[in-house]
Structure formats: C-alpha cells, structure tokens
C-alpha cells in the first residue's frame, strides 16, 4: 500500500527518549467531499478529484484522500459499525490487466492468511453494488500514520533506539512471513508503515512468492535499490535470503538518512554494492550460473571497504549485524532467526514473543491460468467473507 497514511499530531512515543512525530503532509483544502447515497442507501458515492469512490454506507463522511499511486486512490474513513479508522485503497478497473488482477488476489489471500502485529491487516473487502458490474476493487486496511520512507526523508531526528526498534519489528514480521513459506520480495521503506507510537507493520504483498518456487517471475521489477545480488544476476534459485538483504539496505538507510545503493540501472546497482562489499571470491560465486560468473569476472576488481570506517557514527554491533545481512553469497547470509538473536538486538529479542505462522500459505490458486471472470469470482468471495449479508443481494 503506497502513499502516506492518516496524519496525526501525536508525538511518536516509547522506543526511547524523544520520539519523532510523523511528518505532516496537509491535503490541499479538502474539508467537504461531496457524498451521495446510492443503490437504495446501501452505498455512498464520494467524488474525489473527479474520481468516484463508492463504498458501503457504513463508511460515513468525512472521508479524506491520503495517497495516490499507479493503482488509484487511498482514502481514510471511519467504519461506523466498528468505530475504527481504516485506509481504503481503490484499485480502478482491477481486472483489465490479468497480472495486476492476480497481484490483487495474491495480496488479499496472503493478508487474510496472516495474523501478526507487524503485518498490516485487511479489515474489509468492500463488495460491489452489483456482482455483474464488478470492475473496481476496494480494500480496507488498518490505518497507519505514515511510512518509513516519509520518516527517512523528513528532517526529524531519529535516535539509534528508534532505528533498532524499527529493525527489530521488521525482522519479527519477516520471521512470521518466512515461516508461512512466503517471501515478500519487495521490502523497501515505503512498504513499512508506522503509527504514532512507533509500531511498524509490513505491507504490500502483491509480489510475494512461495519460498520453494524456483522460476524467476519477471512480471514486476522489484525496487532496484533493495535487490539482493542474486536477483540482480538473474539467479532463478533464490531463497528467503533476498528479504534479509533488503532489510540490511533499509536499516543502513535509516541510520544514514540516504539510500545505501541508489543504483541508476541494473549495471550501476551491481557496481555500487561491489564497491562496498567487494568483488566476490570464486567460492562465494558457486551458487551462480556460468553467465553470471563470467559477467562478474570481467568487471573491475573491487576491494571490500571497512563498514566501520565508512559509517563511523553507527554502533559497531549494528555494523556487525548489517555485514552479516549484506553478504554476497545468500547461503552464508544471516537468517532472520539468527538476526533476531544477534547481540545488537539483545534488549528487544524475546523468542517467546516472536510467533511463527502455524500453517504454510497455499499458493495453489496461482498454478491455474485463471480467467478474468474466475479472478472476479475469487475476489468477490473474499468480499462476501467480510460482508455475508451481501450474499443474496
């Protein structure tokens, strides 16, 4: 879920010391968004920037636009039945592109399967007023205040305790995700949501994959700056270690307030990471195919830089953990469980409060070439699970 979420004046509290308030992002003078009852009062239509936003009548005014992405608009709204504020994402013409539709279905199924404090929860899939005219998908998520990307680019001070606490929560959520036999594959600061008391939740599972799957899916380009070397080199046999690499990049960006490897393109990305971690040895390249090995051998030889010298302001224990995350060979990269048990996180680590998912996620629905109509039906059923009263309407 992209885009900033609900604004708050609350000061973030309780990672340690003075906490940062989420950056304020005023929305241009929107106090009064026109609302019209529709479909016999069962739905309300809002007109937002010339776009129709049609939700069930329990989402009463006021409604506030809080983000916009390629997929459409995100609004905050109050569910009058539960008295909970939610972020509603509208995916317009959700079934026009089969890959996009499958991505939406995957995200819904994954988030409904997962139940963890550090993973954003789906609160509702809003059913369409008429089944036969089902084109737009509305997903309501629990509402968060901001995201890590907004915090990093703001001028607010972040204490080391903040960064440590954010890292711990990312790893805690990732432990659960990996235990469900799932890779996130697109971890980046904007996919890490925060609320006013520094709670962090991982979102955007549209690119997630089963951990045992070996074919490299190229339907979407994962954000380049956080991509593990094995993905940059088109290794088809990638593992949960790809997410650990992303976490290392994100943590250093938090500590340094700028991206660690801001590559302009594929080639530049690989060069940047080798300039820091050095050219891999033949032993470290064992997992790569011959083409990838040949490519690396013809590059200039890079000597590994000292992380301690390059980042003198970062706690040496944190540096030690990051070096283990940013290991070229995924087979030697630290696992999430071992990262949680690293001395840097001793003050936060509690294995009895780091749950795993008891049932692996089943990606079987991906194995079939679903038609547009079948995908509509599957998402419609997810909506009915939240709104059984619409079953016979």
From Swiss-Prot:
<dbReference type="GO" id="GO:0005524">
    <property type="term" value="F:ATP binding"/>
</dbReference>
<feature type="binding site">
    <location>
        <position position="89"/>
    </location>
    <ligand>
        <name>ATP</name>
    </ligand>
</feature>
<comment type="similarity">
    <text>Belongs to the protein kinase superfamily. CMGC Ser/Thr protein kinase family. MAP kinase subfamily.</text>
</comment>
<dbReference type="InterPro" id="IPR000719">
    <property type="entry name" value="Prot_kinase_dom"/>
</dbReference>
<keyword id="KW-0547">Nucleotide-binding</keyword>
<dbReference type="InterPro" id="IPR050117">
    <property type="entry name" value="MAP_kinase"/>
</dbReference>
<dbReference type="GO" id="GO:0005634">
    <property type="term" value="C:nucleus"/>
</dbReference>
<feature type="modified residue" description="Phosphotyrosine">
    <location>
        <position position="220"/>
    </location>
</feature>
<dbReference type="Pfam" id="PF00069">
    <property type="entry name" value="Pkinase"/>
</dbReference>
<dbReference type="InterPro" id="IPR011009">
    <property type="entry name" value="Kinase-like_dom_sf"/>
</dbReference>
<dbReference type="GO" id="GO:0005737">
    <property type="term" value="C:cytoplasm"/>
</dbReference>
<dbReference type="GO" id="GO:0035556">
    <property type="term" value="P:intracellular signal transduction"/>
</dbReference>
<dbReference type="InterPro" id="IPR017441">
    <property type="entry name" value="Protein_kinase_ATP_BS"/>
</dbReference>
<keyword id="KW-0067">ATP-binding</keyword>
<feature type="active site" description="Proton acceptor">
    <location>
        <position position="186"/>
    </location>
</feature>
<keyword id="KW-0418">Kinase</keyword>
<dbReference type="InterPro" id="IPR008271">
    <property type="entry name" value="Ser/Thr_kinase_AS"/>
</dbReference>
<dbReference type="InterPro" id="IPR003527">
    <property type="entry name" value="MAP_kinase_CS"/>
</dbReference>
<feature type="short sequence motif" description="TXY">
    <location>
        <begin position="218"/>
        <end position="220"/>
    </location>
</feature>
<feature type="modified residue" description="Phosphothreonine">
    <location>
        <position position="218"/>
    </location>
</feature>
<keyword id="KW-0597">Phosphoprotein</keyword>
<feature type="region of interest" description="Disordered">
    <location>
        <begin position="1"/>
        <end position="32"/>
    </location>
</feature>
<dbReference type="GO" id="GO:0106310">
    <property type="term" value="F:protein serine kinase activity"/>
</dbReference>
<feature type="binding site">
    <location>
        <begin position="66"/>
        <end position="74"/>
    </location>
    <ligand>
        <name>ATP</name>
    </ligand>
</feature>
<protein>
    <recommendedName>
        <fullName>Mitogen-activated protein kinase homolog NTF4</fullName>
        <ecNumber>2.7.11.24</ecNumber>
    </recommendedName>
</protein>
<dbReference type="GO" id="GO:0004707">
    <property type="term" value="F:MAP kinase activity"/>
</dbReference>
<dbReference type="GO" id="GO:0004674">
    <property type="term" value="F:protein serine/threonine kinase activity"/>
</dbReference>
<keyword id="KW-0808">Transferase</keyword>
<feature type="domain" description="Protein kinase">
    <location>
        <begin position="60"/>
        <end position="345"/>
    </location>
</feature>
<keyword id="KW-0723">Serine/threonine-protein kinase</keyword>
């Amino acid at each position: 879920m992209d885009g900033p979420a609900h604004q708050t004046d609350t000061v973030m509290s309780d990672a340690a010391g003075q906490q940062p308030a989420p950056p304020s992002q005023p929305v241009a003078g929107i106090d009064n968004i026109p609302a019209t009852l529709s479909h016999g009062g069962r739905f309300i239509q809002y007109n937002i920037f010339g776009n129709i936003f049609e939700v069930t009548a329990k989402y009463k005014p006021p409604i506030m636009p809080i983000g916009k992405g390629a997929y459409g608009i995100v609004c905050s709204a109050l569910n009058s039945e539960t008295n909970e504020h939610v972020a509603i994402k509208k995916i317009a013409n959700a079934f026009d592109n089969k890959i996009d539709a499958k991505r939406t279905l995957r995200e819904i199924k994954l988030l409904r399967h997962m139940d963890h404090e550090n993973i954003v929860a789906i609160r509702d899939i809003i059913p369409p007023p008429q089944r036969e005219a089902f084109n737009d998908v509305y997903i309501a998520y629990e509402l968060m205040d901001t995201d890590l990307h907004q915090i990093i680019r703001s001028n607010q001070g972040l204490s080391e305790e903040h960064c440590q606490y954010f890292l711990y929560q990312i790893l805690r959520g990732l432990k659960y995700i990996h235990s469900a036999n799932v890779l996130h594959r697109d971890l980046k600061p904007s996919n890490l949501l925060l609320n006013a008391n520094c709670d962090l939740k991982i979102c955007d599972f549209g690119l997630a994959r089963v951990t045992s799957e070996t074919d490299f899916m190229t339907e979407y380009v994962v954000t380049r700056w956080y991509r593990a070397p094995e993905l940059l080199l088109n290794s088809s046999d990638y593992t949960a270690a790809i997410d650990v690499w992303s976490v290392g990049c994100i943590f250093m960006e938090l500590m340094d307030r700028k991206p660690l490897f801001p590559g302009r393109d594929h080639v530049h990305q690989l060069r940047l990471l080798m300039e820091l971690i050095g050219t891999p040895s033949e032993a470290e390249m064992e997992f790569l195919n011959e083409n990838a090995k040949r490519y690396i051998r013809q590059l200039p030889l890079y000597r590994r830089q000292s992380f301690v010298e390059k980042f003198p302001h970062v706690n040496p224990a944190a540096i030690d953990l990051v070096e283990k995350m940013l290991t070229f060979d995924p087979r030697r990269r630290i696992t999430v469980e071992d990262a949680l048990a690293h001395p840097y996180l001793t003050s936060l680590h509690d294995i009895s409060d780091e749950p795993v998912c008891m049932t692996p996620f089943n990606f079987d629905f991906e194995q079939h070439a679903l038609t547009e109509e079948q995908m509509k039906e599957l998402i419609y059923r997810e909506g009915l699970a939240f709104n059984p009263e619409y079953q016979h309407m």
